[in-house]
Structures are given as C-alpha cells and as structure tokens.
Amino acid sequence: MYGMQYIQQTIVGIDGSEARFFGYVADNSEEMEPDRIRPAILILPGGGYAMTSDREAEPVALQFLAKGFAVFVLRYSVQPSRYPVALLEAAEAMRLIRANADQWHVNPAQVAVLGFSAGGHLAANLATSVGDEDIREQGGMDPDAVRPNALMLSYPVITAGKYAHLSLIHISE
C-alpha cells in the first residue's frame, strides 16, 4: 500500500535539552517507481535561537515533500541552551538520516540542509569546518560524515564584524 511514514524522534542535547526531529517520507509504490531513492532535505527553522518558527518548518517541509523529497525538520534546542548544543543536534539529525537511508528510501549522498535566519547560521556551521572540533570532541561524530551535500540559506545570520547579530549568538562560557 502506498502511503507515508511520519517519523518522530527526540534528540537529547549535551545539556539535557530535547530537540524534536520529524520526518516526512513517502512510501514507494509498486505501481510507480518501486525502487525509488529520494534526495533528502533537513530543515532548520529560524527564531533567533529563542524559538523555532512554525512557518519555516512543516509548511516548507510539505512543499518539498510534494516535489519528491524525503523531508526532515529539526526543532533544535534554543535558549537557555548554548553553543554547541544545537550544532550537535543538527549533526545527530544528519547522522540519523544517513543511518536510516535504506529504510527511508533516501540517497545518503544527496542530503541538503535548508536553514532560515538562526537556522541558516546553524546550517552554515554544520556545512563548514567552523564546528568540526565540537562535532568530533563533544558529539563523538566524524564531521565529514554529517556534513550536508548541499546547502540552502534563507536570510541567514552569518554577518560578522560591525553588523554582526551578536545578541543571537549564545556561546558557552
């Protein structure tokens, strides 16, 4: 029978916080492409690291699902959690997607991350070497194994210097 898998998991942060991981994965139909392997997208909603926006989560996920993607949304930990909690949760979400690629009919070499605002900041950190040491040492993961194959940034918080969004970047002390 043709349908959809709805995936819900909790990712526990290094500070004990709980991120929510959701997935929308269409089942393969025996009538239509029974062996179809889909590209995947991990969506990281924005919200200034104070919340994760509803409008940048499921509504966006459903649009990509309709285009044939396996789609995942991470409601990562926000305040009072501090860096690198959300980064490690995003890395774990990428690990989960690739570890379950066969079951979820996902091409592990075609996993993109889409981040909005603060989620764009998080996505950029995951995609570059910025957080590699934290991913390796605190997350116990190989940064290259959890790095996305493609990146989409929607009004990301990545400005440095004079116009930086310093109030949004919460670093552990």
Language model region names:
Residues 1-36:
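N-terminal cap/lid segment of alpha/beta-hydrolase-fold proteins
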Residues 37-46:
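Short beta-strand element of the alpha/beta-hydrolase
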Residues 48-50, 71:
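Serine-hydrolase catalytic-loop signature spanning alpha/beta hydrolases and amidase-signature enzymes
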Residues 52-54, 74-108:
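Catalytic nucleophile-loop/oxyanion-hole region of alpha/beta-hydrolase
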Residues 55-72:
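Short amphipathic alpha-helix adjacent to the substrate-entry channel of hydrolases
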Residues 69, 76-78, 156:
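Active-site loop/turn elements of alpha/beta-hydrolase fold enzymes
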Residues 95-166:
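Primarily recognizes the serine-hydrolase "nucleophile elbow" in alpha/beta-hydrolase
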Residues 169-173:
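Conserved small/polar residues in nucleotide/adenosyl-binding loops
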